Amino acid sequence: MPTSSAVYTTFAGQIRNKTISKGGFTFCLAEYLHPALRDIEKMPEDTFDQIVDKYVEMNVAHPFMEGNGRSTRIWLDLILKKRLGKCIDWSKITKNDYLNAMIISHTKSDRIKELLASALTDKINDRETFMKGIDYSYYYEQED
């Protein structure tokens, strides 16, 4: 059996070429992934709602075999920082609330928008906020 580092070396950072699913939800089919990513790239990101819509679409695309949640949360913070001078204080969002909001976000994004808006901060250069965000990002992915 290959080690986890050997497995990650084979696909880490590469756009997936297989269709994947989780919890009964099938993410963007592999054959449509590249066009979907091009469309997501073109989406506007001028307002908070537009940025979160883009984030939701990237979650549905799920471009990698592993690490989608962690990488897209960092990606979201980078867009928010660049466009709005804000980021998410992930310590203000519980794992359960976040995961439940993300599960329904592809059909109803209001809940994830409310949740993220409630945790917006202007501490974009605060190292502690950034590092806590990474810690929480891993926590959201852990099995209970």
Spans of model-derived segments:
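FIC/Doc superfamily catalytic core
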Residues: 1-144
